[in-house]
Curated annotation (Swiss-Prot):
Record: residues binding ATP: 36-43
Protein name (database record): sn-glycerol-3-phosphate import ATP-binding protein UgpC
Organism: Cereibacter sphaeroides (strain ATCC 17023 / DSM 158 / JCM 6121 / CCUG 31486 / LMG 2827 / NBRC 12203 / NCIMB 8253 / ATH 2.4.1.) (Rhodobacter sphaeroides)
NCBIfam families: PRK11650.1
Transport in keyword set: yes
One Pfam assignment: TOBE_2
Keywords: ATP-binding, Cell inner membrane, Cell membrane, Membrane, Nucleotide-binding, Sugar transport, Translocase, Transport
UniProt GO molecular function: ABC-type glycerol-3-phosphate transporter activity; ATP binding; ATP hydrolysis activity
Gene name of the encoded protein: ugpC
Function: Part of the ABC transporter complex UgpBAEC involved in sn-glycerol-3-phosphate (G3P) import. Responsible for energy coupling to the transport system.
EC number(s) from the headed UniProt entry: 7.6.2.10
Family affiliation: Belongs to the ABC transporter superfamily. sn-glycerol-3-phosphate importer (TC 3.A.1.1.3) family.
Length: 349
């Protein structure tokens, strides 16, 4: 196991910078998830750690050793890809053992490592099968086993669950979490799926257009997003964003005055999550929501609508008492769960 350091890491293609000075430290045994939309630079960043992409500027260290100029095989890392990358003519056992054979480990050591990893990943009954005889989830477990037997300093996982169906993704998510709890190997996991990110990570790195917008625990990112981008990306449905103006001792939002201190004369954005809106009392300041669509999900329902000024709003309600389309509701935000952002920079106040 080893700590991993990224120090002002940059990447350019044809003079155009696509990764903009990323800095973070990963502790020994920590599981860090890099999450963001397509094209944000998360896989490029992972490939630079792996040595599959050259670094334009900055420094990457694994276990205290700068690896900028080292080949991938010299970095003591193991990668798991979304397409499994198994040898079709080899059995599960042979696929898992292949890297160890190349490294010229003894036959006894190879057998012991393969057996231990197969037990951990529940592959014991599949060792003599070939990839074509396996399900997608089983193939991904073999790919993980092939990485695990190497006892690397770090695991790098690039969207390993994206080819699986929803049920298998849940099963594999739980298995990866249990595996990390057992082996405690330093890991970097890349995904665009916020559920994977929130449930697996010790810490998240939220990427946007080559910039690490926020690096924090899942709870901190959900409860205190640093920017409007993070607030809108993490959480489903996304956080409601309402244009607002500071009045000093209050906030003007959609024609209503809320008792929320805010810098006078400043254009702001009020963020409120769908679960932090409630039906307003007769004397309580609130917004009239014209419901246009309702998504019923069983335990919960999400009412989508617009305020009088056209601002879109989503409200979460109990599934047993959902609102109906074309309803008009007076709703108010929970005062203890509001988020204020600067309208120009998008940064949290």
């Amino acid at each position: 196991m080893a700590e991993i350091s990224l120090r002002d890491v940059r990447k350019s293609y044809a003079g155009i910078e696509v990764i903009h000075g990323v800095d973070f430290e990963i502790a020994d045994g920590e599981f860090v998830v890099i999450v963001g939309p397509s094209g944000c630079g998360k896989s490029t960043l992972l490939r630079m750690v792996a040595g599959l992409e050259e670094i334009t500027a900055g420094e990457i260290a694994i276990g205290g050793r700068v690896v900028n100029r080292l080949e991938p095989r010299e970095r003591d890392i193991a990668m798991v890809f979304q397409n499994y990358a198994l040898y079709p003519h080899m059995t599960v056992r042979e696929n898992m053992a292949y890297g160890l054979r190349i490294a010229k480990l003894s036959k006894a050591e190879i057998e012991e490592r393969v057996a231990r990893s197969a037990t951990m990943l529940e592959l014991g009954q599949l060792l003599d099968r070939k990839p074509r005889q396996l399900s997608g989830g089983q193939r991904q477990r073999v790919a993980m086993g092939r990485a695990l037997v190497r006892n690397p300093a770090a695991f790098l996982l690039d969207e390993p669950l994206s080819n699986l169906d929803a049920k298998l993704r849940v099963q594999m998510r739980l298995q990866i979490k249990e595996l990390q709890r057992t082996v405690r190997t330093t890991s970097i996991y890349v995904t665009h799926d916020q559920v994977e990110a929130m449930t697996l990570a010790d810490r998240l790195v939220v990427m946007n257009a080559g910039v690490a917008e926020q690096i924090a625990t899942p709870a901190e990112i959900y409860d205190r997003p640093a920017t409007t981008f993070v607030a809108g990306f993490i959480g489903s449905p996304a956080m409601n964003m309402l244009p607002a103006r500071g009045l000093g001792d209050a906030l003007e939002v959609a024609g209503q005055r809320l008792a929320v201190p805010a810098p006078a004369g400043r254009d702001l954005i009020l963020g409120v999550r769908p679960e932090h809106l409630h039906a307003a009392g007769p004397e309580e300041p609130g917004f009239e929501l014209h419901v246009q669509a309702v998504e019923w999900l069983g335990a919960d329902a999400f009412a989508h609508g617009r305020l009088a000024d056209g601002t879109e709003l989503v409200l979460r309600t109990p599934g047993k008492a959902p609102v109906r389309e074309r309803d008009r509701l007076k709703v108010a935000p929970d005062a203890a769960a509001l988020h204020l952002f600067d309208a120009e920079t998008g940064r949290r106040l």
